[in-house]
């Protein structure tokens, strides 16, 4: 452990903060799985598989445009302002229509569906993990914590991602917004997770995630403890909003078992 990143007072305060925690819930994309790296690899492969040079001058142009539109659409989706079907159509349609304004949604539906399937199939095969993620999950398992995955991702790909990296054998529960119809940070998904776990005491649950607006805000509003994984912070810090850490590798020393 690097004492410059995780001081003894923070360790002691965090252990008091998490006393009684039995369930550790982890976000999947960009917390356990390196979604950005995997997504970019899948997008490059999609460009070749689907001959997207029909629309874009280069693969980099396609990837940059997709990422920009997808990010904006996910913000809307997380706020329940658009449907999943709209997101999955427009993250492909909008980049293409930016290059070819005459393309209509109706004429592009079949192409968007094909792109969606190809991209998600390729994405599910990628295996890049966030540094320290596997070690954290194995540590939690060895120290008798129950482990859950709580994700806003799509059912038809999240389980395949877990299987591809071998995490499906290490977690006790997987709760997906897609399955219950509400996204983080809606408290109902956290309530559902507690009911699924069989332990409805919020103080016995903690959320580890990379998104303060969804993972952390929802957990805190539901009475859970929370850990924000944020590589931009310079050292671990514990506030009223939970713990923030720059690396998952700091967490095993904080979770010492039940």
Question: What kind of region is each of these model predictions?
Answer:
Residues 1-24, 37, 134, 138-141, ...:
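Asp-based, Mg2+/Mn2+-dependent phosphohydrolase catalytic module
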Residues 4-68:
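Active-site neighborhood of HAD-like aspartate-dependent phosphohydrolases
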Residues 14, 20, 85-86, 108-113, ...:
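Short, acidic loop-to-helix structural element flanking the phosphoryl-transfer center
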Residues 39-40, 56-60, 84-85, 105-109, ...:
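Alpha-helix N-cap/helix-initiation sites
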Residues 39-47, 66-70, 92, 96, ...:
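Hydrophobic alpha-helical core bundles mediating ligand binding, dimerization, or RNAP-core interactions
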Residues 43, 63-66, 89, 190, ...:
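A general structural signal for well-ordered alpha-helical segments in protein cores
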Residues 51-55, 98-107, 166-170, 198-199:
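Short helix-capping segments at alpha-helix termini
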Residues 71-118:
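A metal-dependent, Asp-based hydrolase signature
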